From Swiss-Prot:
Keywords: Ribonucleoprotein, Ribosomal protein. One of its GO terms (molecular function) is structural constituent of ribosome. This is Large ribosomal subunit protein uL29. The gene is rpmC. Belongs to the universal ribosomal protein uL29 family. GO terms for biological process: translation.
Length: 66
């Protein structure tokens, strides 16, 4: 149910807030990939989690624009 709560929180946000969150998530993904390439990342599953969150944010943005 944790994911459903996250999606509901996303749906409650405005388009500007969603765009800010999307930019922040993409920056985090970039940093995680960089850490993974330099063997500094312990929790590699975080990359997958952030990628899915980016997709969730983009989906909510598309739903709001439709």
């Amino acid at each position: 149910m944790k994911i459903n709560k996250y999606v509901e929180d996303l749906k409650a946000k405005s388009a500007a807030e969603l765009n800010e969150e999307l930019v922040a998530a993409k920056k985090e993904l970039f940093n995680l990939r960089f850490q993974n390439a330099t063997n500094q990342l312990d929790n590699t599953s975080r990359i997958k989690e952030v990628r899915k969150n980016i997709a969730r944010i983009q989906t909510v943005i598309a739903q709001k624009n439709a």
